């Protein structure tokens, strides 16, 4: 139902609108309704021996071609196989049947890459033994290149070096410290598809001898799905089911975003689906599950988790331009309800020694909060408090944040500290 807005002085009718400055979200199921394949464009005109030298020397000189990287990764990884112990399908695509032996690139459709292959510097000293660690190194640089925080970047690079040394004790990093030639590789769609295919394959074959290649690719799984991760984290930190957590959504914006994320048919809860790789496989250019597209849900969920003493939530990004006041109150009420009650019940017994609760106890005083986690009871109580946080609620929040130190700007932790520790 449309609402008519009129100017009082002359009854002029206007239709208020905002500019459409954001692209709509794209769902993975919609991609597969239009196409039944994920194309991967690779130049296969050069031998694996040549490509191995091109990549090795290119990394050392700081002038490696991403086309060489992709072609080498394909050549080095295409013979890796795994035997399925169950049927594997996703979005109507039959990847393989139980008993089939499949490879990494059975997850995509290989296409020839047109154009001239860039020149490279050969290196006859490189051997097939390099193929045991060089793909790991190239894929690991994807993970390193995704972060710009110097300390964390160094930690990841050190971890990658250690992974490679476990395969080759004489390994030395090929990219000098401080050089960031690989940061832009994530902009190449063929490279990211290889990353996604590798991770999806080894997620299925977790015990494969080459599963350590996931060191760098694991960040491809659920990329740009931070709000979905927030939902999962909130369920864990509260100990409540997905259904019960959902009943605690008290803001229209959060509800709208929850509906957006829970659109049926997207295989969110299917572990071996293409869905977790919707970004790197190119299934979506705007994830329906990102914190950018679900800022209110992300803020509410992470703030609630923080007030329940989650260490992970302190560094969650604080979104811009959301309705902080109502979202903060909703998060505080939810955290206070969970933090003020313990979901305890006897789980086992010896013989018939079972505790039976006494329901005949007297009622609560007018201002006493409910003892359980039922949102209906808590909303009724909150109405009696004139829909404003009580002093005890504010004290609860202050205790949750008062010990937080070293908080980064524009994080949930920083926001909560300034809001409650006054």
Curated annotation (Swiss-Prot):
GO terms for cellular component: helical viral capsid; host cell cytoplasm; ribonucleoprotein complex; viral nucleocapsid. Homomultimerizes to form the nucleocapsid. Binds to viral genomic RNA; this interaction contributes to the virion assembly. N in the nucleocapsid interacts (via C-terminus) with the P protein (via C-terminus); this interaction allows to package the L polymerase in the virion and positions the polymerase on the template, since P acts as a bridge between N and L. N(0) interacts with the P protein; this interaction prevents the uncontrolled aggregation of N(0). Interacts with the matrix protein (inner layer); this interaction contributes to the virion assembly. Interacts with the L polymerase. GO terms for molecular function: RNA binding. Keywords: Capsid protein, Helical capsid protein, Host cytoplasm, Ribonucleoprotein, RNA-binding, Viral nucleoprotein, Virion. Its main location: virion. This is Nucleoprotein. Coiled coil: none annotated. InterPro entries: Rhabdo_ncapsid (IPR000448), Rhabdovirus_ncapsid_C (IPR023331), Rhabdovirus_ncapsid_N (IPR023330), Rhabdovirus_nucleoprotein-like (IPR035961). It comes from the Viruses. Residues 350-390 are annotated as: Interaction with the phosphoprotein. Encapsidates the genome in a ratio of one N per nine ribonucleotides, protecting it from nucleases. The encapsidated genomic RNA is termed the NC and serves as template for transcription and replication. The nucleocapsid is bullet-shaped with the tip containing 8 turns of a conical spiral before reaching the helical cylindrical trunk. Nucleocapsid assembly is concomitant with replication, therefore viral replication depends on the intracellular concentration of free N, termed N(0). All replicative products are resistant to nucleases. Belongs to the vesiculovirus nucleocapsid protein family. RNA binds at residues 143, 152, 206, 214, 286, 317, 408. SUPFAM superfamilies: Rhabdovirus nucleoprotein-like. It is found in: Virion; Host cytoplasm. The keyword Electron transport does not apply.
